[in-house]
């Protein structure tokens, strides 16, 4: 899959090109999902007895939107992917492509639509959780958006609980999906297990899990 610089729409200002939401939006806590990917790599390399490559970003995004309700036989146009990361962090360690600078403003296109990436660094006056909540709320309030998929840090802090509270007021015509590594308290949204999409992106096949290689004898 090739990532290329996205061409801005003619007749639109710089602000309009960068602030309008598409019908489908993915919002991600970048360091959190990178940490989860690392843990999966370590565990499955031990279990399967083979090297696990870095997660394929394009493949992961495809799996997210399928879990988020986009039909595989009905492409939905543009998908905005917002990667929220700490200011002192320059890249993923367990995804390819990895660099936030290289991903920002880039896009790839496949049978599910055009995925347009924005990498947003957290400034000193806010926190990553607060920024993610602000972005998610902006998306929910946007009339253009039909589907929102959020990957928050559901293991540390109260970001997940604050999202639950905020989404109580979400319009019924939006499909909202939160991703976590285990079932979490529900609300006005769908839930999906984050590990399934990451396993696909890491190239871990279901058949391998059904018949893993024997552990080496001591």
Each language-model region and where it sits:
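A signal for specific C-terminal beta-sheet/loop modules enriched in small/flexible residues
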Residues: 1, 47-53, 177-182
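Nuclease catalytic cores that cleave nucleic-acid phosphodiester bonds
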Residues: 110-218
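Long, compositionally biased intrinsically disordered regions
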Residues: 3-18, 204-218
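Short, flexible coil/linker elements and helix-boundary hinge sites characteristic
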Residues: 2-5, 49, 65-68, 143, ...
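Domain-level signal for Mg2+-assisted phosphodiester chemistry and nucleotide/NA-binding surfaces
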Residues: 6, 11-120
């Amino acid at each position: 899959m090739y990532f290329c610089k996205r061409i801005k729409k003619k007749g639109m200002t710089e602000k309009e090109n960068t602030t309008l939401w598409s019908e489908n939006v993915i919002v991600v806590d970048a360091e959190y999902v990178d940490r989860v990917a690392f843990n999966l790599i370590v565990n499955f390399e031990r279990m399967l007895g083979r090297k696990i490559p870095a997660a394929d970003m394009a493949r992961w995004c495809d799996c997210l939107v399928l879990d988020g309700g986009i039909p595989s036989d009905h492409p939905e146009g543009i998908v905005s992917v917002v990667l929220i990361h700490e200011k002192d962090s320059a890249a993923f360690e367990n995804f390819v492509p990895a660099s936030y600078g290289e991903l920002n403003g880039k896009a790839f296109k496949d049978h599910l639509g055009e995925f347009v990436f924005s990498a947003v660094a957290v400034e000193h006056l806010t926190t990553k959780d607060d920024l993610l909540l602000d972005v998610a709320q902006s998306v929910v309030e946007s009339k253009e958006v039909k589907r929102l998929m959020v990957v928050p840090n559901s293991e540390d802090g109260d970001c997940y609980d604050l999202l639950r509270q905020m989404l109580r007021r979400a319009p019924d015509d939006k499909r909202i999906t939160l991703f976590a590594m285990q079932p979490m308290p529900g609300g006005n949204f769908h839930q999906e297990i984050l590990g399934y999409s990451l396993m696909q992106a890491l190239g871990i096949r279901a058949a391998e899990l059904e018949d893993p290689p024997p552990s080496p004898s001591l």
